[in-house]
Amino acid sequence: MKNLFNFFKTSSELRLAYRLLKQINQKRSFYGAMTDFDLANQTNIFKKRLANGEKLKDIRVDAFAVAREATKRILGKTPYDVQILGGLILDMGSVAEMKTGEGKTIASIPPVYLNALLGQGVIVSTVNEYLAERDAEDNGKVYNFLGLTVGINKTEMDANTKRMMYNADITYSVHSELGFDYLRDNMVFSAAEKVQRGLNFCLIDEVDSILIDEAKTPLIISGGKTNLPAQYLSANQFVNTLIAEDFYIDEETKGIKLNDKGIDKANAFFGLRNLYEIQNSEIVHRIQNALRANKVMKRDVEYIVQDGKIALVDQFTGRIMAGRSYSEGLQQALQAKEGLEIEPETKTLATITYQNFFRLFKKLSGMTGTAKTEEQEFIDVYNMRVNVIPTNKPMIRKDERDEIFATSHEKNQAIISEVERVHKRGQPILIGTSQVVDSETLSEMLNQKGLYHTVLNAKQNQLEAEIIAKAGRKNAITIATNMAGRGTDIILEPGVTELGGLYILGTDKAEARRIDNQLRGRSGRQGDVGISRFFISLQDQLFRRFTNFDQIFGAYGQTNGAIKGKYIHAVLLAAQKKIEGFNFDMRKTVLSYDDVIRQQRDLIYAQRDILLQIENFDHYIQKMIIRAVDIILNYDFIILPNQEIHYKNLINFLNDNLSRITHFNFGQIGIENYPIEQLNEFLIKQLETIYFKQIQSVLKENLGKTYFESERYIILSTLDSQWQNHIDTIDKLRSSANLVQYSQKNPYQIFTEEATKKFNILVAESAYQAIVSLFNNSNAEKIEYIKAILSDGTAISYPADSPQEIIDQIIASNEERIAAARKAKEEKQPEFIEKQLAKLKIEKVESGEEFELWKIGDSKLVNLKKEMPLDEKQNILVKMQQEQLEMMSEEEKNLIQEQNLEIVEIEEIEEEIQNENPQKVEFVDFKNDPDAYNKLIFGADYADKQLISSEEEDNNEKTNINNNEDLERTKGEAQQTAKNPNE
């Protein structure tokens, strides 16, 4: 009966997973008998099955069995049945709750492998880069064996490297970098610049930390700095004049605002009539930040000061959030409070919350040690169920009842006494704190007792994983924030089990039971023994904020030692549930506000993607002209209150804003003749004609086929600028939503209405500003060019309005290029001459001390002085070759002549000279120029060289004439052969 009851308690997903597990286990022997080659080749078989139309669920059992066998062979670890169960839940797009030490990393291998087979990319998101690198390296061995590629995405990588990492089959990355890459991808001006591909499947490690604890944290890319330190300093100075009676703090929400006394002081301090008039919203914003920084936020709790900078502390992990800062002026308010240099405030350029980013994935799943208490939120926000996976071995850790004391001092004394007691027998103890200041207080008390210990908090987090891993050694005392070292197993040193295992001592309750369970879960992994206990005081934040503190403290505040009785424990549990509900509501509120922005962001980003793909913007420009004209004709200085048109203002406006490039005079087209009902259509046609007939035609002339890239850049940059202004305005609108509380309206309703109005303005204003920029596109200016002739006879062109120093630089650089080419030609001349002689069957066969022996043709040899210049040798050798030709019979002469003609065909020589020296080659006319052959061999200035005697010139001229006659005959025969190929 008990088993039947447990069966019905089990979710439908987990019941399906059990059935699939049975089938996977049946495949174990089949795949276990395969060779490594055959096992790895299953990846190709699976891909073919998917290509033939099968779905992932059709190959799931086989793929899981293959991944299990590969893990066994490569890592030497056979995944337990519970790990396969966890993997199946992950593949179903749900959350798998697996206790600490149950092997979540191994459990992720089969579902990641299966989903990577689609070839659309799988992303594994982790909480820090250490875990990303560790898991990518370990699990990557299995994936590589199975023929899949693995990438690691890191913060410091350039765009090209990131693109390679995302193009891998499986990509490991920190969650924050995934979101920032998404935002950056939607700020590029070319589709090729994007680094991410489609958001297909994401498996989130420590999913509760990312999707619950950090859900309210927006990812923000900032820019456009403005530096107004006086405003922050004056607000800080004002807040320091206030006393407790001047403002109200809500302990539950940590909200703070001025009361009537505070408002009167603000009016007097800033010289205002009414602080909350709309024109004073910026002052209100600064005061609100200064109040929060000075009266609510605590140093070494929410932030620390490190190297003269404000560093944020993650309230759930205790880690420093490197590279992050508060937005909307809060960072500057903290700097003013701490007397630090006030950095310029930045403008939000792009932003998204983790909630909305991860909801972009087609398929999402996650694993963690504790999530069941937040299941309803996972269902409502992410449509993910939470399934608790049973442990591989029974859990035998003892979770002792909380010890509750009246004061913090009593609690700390009891903690030190307990540490001394446990340490005496050598049992390792891990003390979990939620705040840096608490860890430092306990550390000082332990030092006073002479107890050696290690502290891990936001100030010492460099060796986090290493420190946590050593916490299981004998006599070890480790103080750490509750979530430090998450994802790192604490291995018990031999002999520690006999001492009772790892002792977990919590120093206060977290805002979620889930966080407390995470701390407990550091002990008792894989059936190990262990113990956990929490020490609490009535002065802890949980009691102060979420109970009737005065009543509780009045009843128990004088108690010595631990407070007994069930009631106080019930109050503690109720307070924890209350804050869980409060935080859930806060996250829902953040999500509801962000959903308004999300819908607008989706529209803008979808529009950007279209603009990145198309190459003809005419249709868009026509639409934008219509919107621009509509805006122009709604300006109150053009359309007067009586609906009359101020034509002069209209003409001046058009000439000032739309005529800089074309110098078009709108006063000469008869605008005054058109009444208001016809003016709109008339202006649209005029602007279309001006743009497409004048501006775009010049754009095409100047930029060629890629003219549209200039249009794309203008349209995108205008859209981005307007969007960035919009989200900056919306951020301020959201932060000041409480200013409408006196209007008896729902702040969210007011926010939604105002955000929608402002978005409509954004769309219209983007179109108008884009048209103004397109009509003033400097690339569309007509440019007159001047031609200059260089020393080699080539010409270059430059804009007529170029400064003289620029012209001189252009000419000088080209002359340097020409000189370098000439030098290169001279250096290659010997090689060129030898090459040409070789083609004429003239080659050097022997070289002595004074003479060189050259061979001409197949028989003739001649000795030449070694010191003779190569061009003189060339002259003599070619001349002797010509003489040899004259002494041959007509038949031999024709044969060699044909061979030579094949070698010195004009097209071949011209092409070769061009390759050797990219200068202009003059055409050599063999038919009409008797010196053509020698010009070809010796160069175009042959006539100026006196290389042979006049008598020899006469003989050479005769030879050239004979050669030309032979050439004509050969050409004629070649042409005849071309006409009659059979002959």
Curated annotation (Swiss-Prot):
Q: What processes does the entry annotate via GO biological process terms?
A: intracellular protein transmembrane transport; protein import; protein targeting; protein transport by the Sec complex
Cystine pairs: none
Q: Which GO terms describe its cellular component?
A: cell envelope Sec protein transport complex; cytosol; plasma membrane
Q: Domain of life of the organism in this record?
A: Bacteria
Q: Which NCBIfam families match?
A: PRK09200.1, secA
Family of this protein: Belongs to the SecA family.
Q: What is this protein called?
A: Protein translocase subunit SecA
**What species is this protein from?**
Mesomycoplasma hyopneumoniae (strain 232)
Phylogenetic lineage: Bacteria, Bacillati, Mycoplasmatota, Mycoplasmoidales, Metamycoplasmataceae
